Amino acid sequence: SVTFGTIFTLAIILGINGCFDFFFVAGDRVLLTADQRNYVISFATIINTVLRTVIICVMTAHQMNILLLYGCASALVIIKAGIIVCYSHNNYTYLDKKAVPDRGAMEKRWEVIYQQILGIIQTGAPTVLATILLNLVSVSVYSIYNMVISGLNGVLSIFISGLPAGFGDLIARREETTLRKTVSEFEVAYYYILSIVYGLAFALIMPFVSVYTKGLSDANYYYPLLGAVIVLNGLLYNIKTPQSMLIVSAGMYRETRWRVTIQGLIIIVFGAIGGRLAGMVGIMLGSCLSNLYRTIDLLFFTPKYITNASPLKSLLRMLLVMVNIIVIYGLSLVYSPECMSYLQWFKLAIIYGVWAVVVVTASAYAFEKKEFISVMRRMLSLVKRKV
């Protein structure tokens, strides 16, 4: 059995990464993000992840002590921090970090902190509610599905990295025509990716779970209804990204404070009621309701106060995402071979992936031809420039 001391020490070690990043690198990360140089942060993160994976694999193969293993892996945060800090210091030599802070420029900081806290509540509520209302077995089952969704959300976050600063610049210069055009093209590109990612998620999550939990007998991890609801919640969480990103770009934290508060209350109240009535599925339905409310709210708030555009176009694009996902998932109803290994699952993912790309590309060309061609030209131009 694992002792309390081991668990406590392991928790401290695992928390080092976040603490070190917050206290030593947070300022440089903010600076790079504001300057739209997120690629530096991404590069440092990739280096850290690769080295961390190598260390964990090698030390696990040699059956090293778990505290030593994660201690060595966590120590790599120094390399990540070093890359970011060195780049920042070499490229922003004109900055005086000892200058007197301009408190007026940060007058919205408490509004930002408030919304960040509500964001933590939004993402952490299902786990907390399941722990209080259900049992640890339910939490264990939920964690498997949530791991998949967290990975998908991480992939999607790559495509919006650095964009809020760019949109914020257009908003500050009041270039509404350019802003509307850019936002429209971004919506088409983002919803293109979202349709593929979550269409495949609906089709592949259960085959993945069956392979990932093969041999585990402590709980029944194969729960299709829960898988579907969790993926739906992830979709509703991400489908509002283009609109919520503009809120960040415009710095409209105070104006949306009560709206975000309602979102947090919905997941707590309806999640608790749903947990009592339907277990983990009920909790996730409460989360779905919370994200649906926020999606509808942003669908009308953003055009009215930021872009001065009609919300109808965004609504139709969201509906097109839903249709694309249904068509992509439809293939799994016709062709769904049993997966007994990761190789079989990977082959199935390739087949579904090709189908998803064909479906989404065809729909984008049919209904968003102008914006889709413009996005493709930008991508080709970017590739040629890199080559």
Predicted regions and their residues:
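Membrane-proximal transmembrane or re-entrant/amphipathic helices at the cytosolic face
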Residues: 332-387
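Short runs within selected transmembrane alpha-helices of multi-pass transporters and secretion channels
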Residues: 10-33, 41-56, 69-85, 119, ...
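Interhelical loop/hinge segments that connect adjacent transmembrane helices in multipass membrane
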Residues: 82-124, 128, 166, 174-181, ...
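Interfacial/gating helices of multi-pass transporter permease domains
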Residues: 66-71, 105-108, 112, 130-150, ...
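Interfacial segments at transmembrane-helix termini and the short loops linking adjacent helices
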Residues: 1-14, 204-235
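Helix-terminus/linker motif at the lipid-water interface of multi-pass membrane proteins
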Residues: 1, 58-63, 121-151, 169-170, ...
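Interfacial transmembrane-helix starts/ends
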Residues: 8, 106, 175-192, 196-204, ...
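Helix-loop junctions and terminal segments of transmembrane helices
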Residues: 33, 92-93, 149-187, 243-249
